[in-house]
From Swiss-Prot:
Record-given protein name: Putative transcriptional regulatory protein Mevan_1098
InterPro entries, sorted: RNA_pol_sigma70_r4, Tfx_C, Tfx_DNA-bd_arc, Tfx_DNA-bd_euryarc, Tfx_DNA-bd_sf_arc
Organism: Methanococcus vannielii (strain ATCC 35089 / DSM 1224 / JCM 13029 / OCM 148 / SB)
Role: Putative transcriptional regulator.
GO molecular function, one term: DNA binding
Gene Ontology BP terms: DNA-templated transcription initiation
Membership in a protein family: Belongs to the Tfx family.
HAMAP family to which the protein is assigned, alphabetical: HTH_type_Tfx
Length: 142
């Protein structure tokens, strides 16, 4: 399978996941710890670029975007998502509770004490996935 990662990067990441130190990996691979550190750093950078690429693509193909305004009660967000997805005839893959958990994990910086303190965008994809985006970034694109 094609990837943005080299075989060496994949091997290093797998060994790190298994708990090996960079020093141990360097010894096994016959190289320096500094080299392993650089390989791991580049792998993580490539992963971040791949994630950003997918986010850009998903944003382009997204049929539905919702601006969550400042002052919105977080508990109202699932209903807003479900209403918008019903309008677009999209089945969202999450329950209200799962959406709340998703919002808690991905939009923490926009929320304080259950209230939205900074607007943000929720994107609903055709496949029912949802994403959170910064409102200012979205505004800059348009």
């Amino acid at each position: 399978m094609e990837s943005f990662l080299t075989e060496i990067q994949i091997r290093v990441l797998n060994l790190r996941k298994k708990g090996h130190t960079q020093e141990e990996i360097a010894h096994v691979m016959g190289t320096s710890r500094a080299n392993i550190s650089m390989v791991e750093k580049r792998a993580r950078e490539n992963i971040e670029k791949a994630k950003n690429t997918l986010n850009i693509y998903n944003d382009i193909i997204a049929p539905s975007k919702i601006k969550v305004e400042k002052g919105t009660d977080v508990f109202n967000i699932p209903n807003v998502i479900f209403s918008k997805s019903d309008e677009e005839e999209i089945h969202v893959n999450y329950s209200s509770l799962q959406i709340m958990e998703f919002i808690n994990q991905n939009a923490k910086r926009y929320i304080k004490n259950r209230m939205v303190v900074e607007p943000f965008i929720i994107t609903i994809l055709q496949n029912g996935e949802i994403y959170v985006h910064d409102f200012e970034e979205e505004k800059a694109k348009n």
